[in-house]
């Protein structure tokens, strides 16, 4: 089986996602207890894509996260660095312009997109700050970023229960439904090591984003961070 280490070497992370691509969406639905749909809807509302706007969906995987933007009439570009995920996505949604790309070295010109979004992917990037700067670079002045990521529950008793779920319950569930359960051990470990809500907001600000704010979902299990590029 394949899993990445917490130093997040790009080739390790890409290989890990190559191995889970076929059953990735199903596994996410099971492990999130069905909450993934509600989280995607919250992302779509926060991005607020409009007809003819250009939206970059980073770490888009199979493009499940891209579809809500396409339905608004926006031009959405699903971008990922896992060839396995891109291949599955192309088989399912051949009409979308799938693009291979590393979040720290995006293959796009400056000031192109009205919105850039990344769901459950920033945590897997080796250099978070470089990725935030690249998102800023490719966003047009006045545009926005929306980041959806696992975070830290705000209520201490629930935080304890959630940590137990990550470390004890999640691995056996993953073994039952995933093609690469070891990847979900990495998932649990990377969530625990991820910065909390204020810390990530600070990093967005240092990357250039203004009016940074966040909203907790499911008690802080997931958090939406949003920022804007000054006009």
From Swiss-Prot:
Coiled coil: none annotated. It is an enzyme of class 2 (transferase). Methyltransferase required for the conversion of demethylmenaquinol (DMKH2) to menaquinol (MKH2). This is Demethylmenaquinone methyltransferase. GO terms for biological process: menaquinone biosynthetic process; methylation. It catalyses: a 2-demethylmenaquinol + S-adenosyl-L-methionine = a menaquinol + S-adenosyl-L-homocysteine + H(+). It comes from the Bacteria. Pfam families: Ubie_methyltran.
């Amino acid at each position: 089986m394949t899993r990445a280490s917490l130093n997040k070497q790009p080739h390790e992370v890409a290989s890990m996602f190559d191995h889970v691509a076929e059953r990735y969406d199903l596994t996410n639905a099971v492990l999130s207890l069905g909450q993934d749909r509600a989280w995607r809807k919250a992302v779509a509302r926060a991005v607020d894509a409009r007809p003819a706007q250009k939206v970059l969906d980073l770490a888009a995987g199979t493009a499940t996260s891209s579809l809500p933007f396409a339905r608004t009439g926006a031009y959405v570009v699903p971008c990922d660095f896992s060839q396995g995920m891109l291949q599955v996505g192309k088989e399912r949604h051949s009409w979308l312009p799938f693009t291979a790309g590393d979040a720290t070295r995006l293959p796009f010109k400056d000031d192109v997109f009205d919105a850039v979004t990344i769901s459950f992917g920033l945590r897997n990037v080796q250099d978070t700050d470089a990725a935030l700067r690249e998102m800023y670079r490719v966003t047009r002045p006045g545009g926005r970023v929306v980041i959806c990521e696992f975070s830290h529950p705000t209520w201490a008793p629930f935080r304890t229960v959630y940590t137990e779920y990550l470390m004890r319950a999640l691995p056996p569930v993953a073994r039952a439904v995933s093609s690469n359960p070891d990847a979900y051990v990495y998932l649990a470990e990377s969530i625990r090591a991820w910065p909390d809500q204020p810390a990530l907001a600070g990093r967005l600000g240092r990357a250039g984003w203004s009016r940074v704010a966040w909203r907790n979902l499911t008690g802080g299990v997931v958090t939406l961070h949003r920022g804007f590029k000054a006009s």
